[in-house]
Each structure stands twice: as structure tokens, then as C-alpha cells.
Amino acid sequence: AIKEWLSPKFEDNYNHRHSSQLYPLFDGMPKEIQADPKLQGAFRKLIELKLDRHWTNWEKQGGFMSFGLVQLGQAATSLGDAELAYRCLVPLVNRYWLSNLASTHNYRSLFNTDISGGMPAVLIKMLVASDPGIVSLLPALPKAWPSGTIEGVLCRGQIEVERLHWDGKAIQAVLRSSVRQEVRLVAPGPIQAISVGNGSGAAVRPDGPASRKLSLPAGVEVTVDVTLK
């Protein structure tokens, strides 16, 4: 697992709620980690250890702080590990909310807003992720969600995913860009077919097995239908 401390004098504590060594993955993945599968594996192992050691039997225990799970979930989505992200999301959804929808720091105690933004952020990032010039659809979709819809996701580059619907291998995304631009649209697997249903000036061109270059006009709703292999 990735280490928390530079000095060998300090031992990592996998039972602790903090995960400062996951900081590089809180919002996306740096290029040096993208290029190193072994490093990705070390980050993934840390998340697994934290979940197994600190968050085990979460249904019966109190005192665990919601922000720690948010951090693990954000890192898992950056790695594209859908099932690991889902493991983080389930207790986030079930443990830290009162009947009036107020969010808490510990299990049903201590009003706190960390999870109010953190839990939706993990969920959204599982379904839509973005970097400058890149929009990724369903980058960490768990098996528990074979179909679904999400609306109103704001992406980097002044792009909104107004609606994203998926059902098995069929994906439909409705996008609107505030400026004219070309972006790389990334699917969760190899693309069999893709089409642009509306949007004057919109066009797609080849890129990679699971991605296409998409030209977006300014201020126009563009519907993209994708069929995965």
C-alpha cells in the first residue's frame, strides 16, 4: 500500500480515519500515477485496507467520521474502481443522515456538512468525470446500477451534462457547452456505435477504442447516443 510517512521511523495506521496519502486522487489522477499501474495498485490497496480495518462492521459501530469515507470514495472513483467506490458510498448514504435530512459528522450525531457535499460528489464522480477537454461517462459504474439517469452535472470547460441515461450497453448523453469547443468523450468500454442526434454543428470523429472527439457548438443542446460492444 502507498505509505503515509516518508520516514521509515513511522508506521502506517490503517485503523485511522485519516488518509492524507490519498490526496493526489481526491480530484482526478495525476499523469505520473496514470502511467504507473503498480502505483495505482498501491493506492487501491490502501483504500481496501482502510475499509477492512477502520470501516469494518460499519452497520453496528458509531464514532466513525463521514469525511474519511468521502476521501476514500473520491480516491476510488479517480482510480475508476467502481465496486470500491460503491463500498464507500453505501455507508455514506445510510449512516450519516437524520430523518430531517440534516447530515452528521459521526453516526447520527454532531451536525456537520462535510457529507452534504461529499456524498453527492462521490456519486456524481462515479457517473460523470471531467478534466479540461475531457468528459468521461460512467467512469466508475458499479454492478448495482445496471440502468439509471442523472441530470444537471456541471463539467470543466463550461460544459453541462444535462441528462445522462444508461441501460446495459446503451448510453445517451445530452450535453450543452457555453463555448464552441472540441472535447474527448470517453465511454466506460469499447464503443460499437455512436451518433449525434441533434445539435447543429456537432460532430464526432475517431479517437480511440473507447473514446471519440466531439465538436460542441456554443449554447446548443447536443444528444449523443453510444452503444458499447
Protein language model annotation of sequence segments:
Residues 1-135, 145, 171:
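Active-site core of glycosidic bond-cleaving carbohydrate-active enzymes
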Residues 83-228:
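Non-catalytic C-terminal accessory modules of carbohydrate-active enzymes
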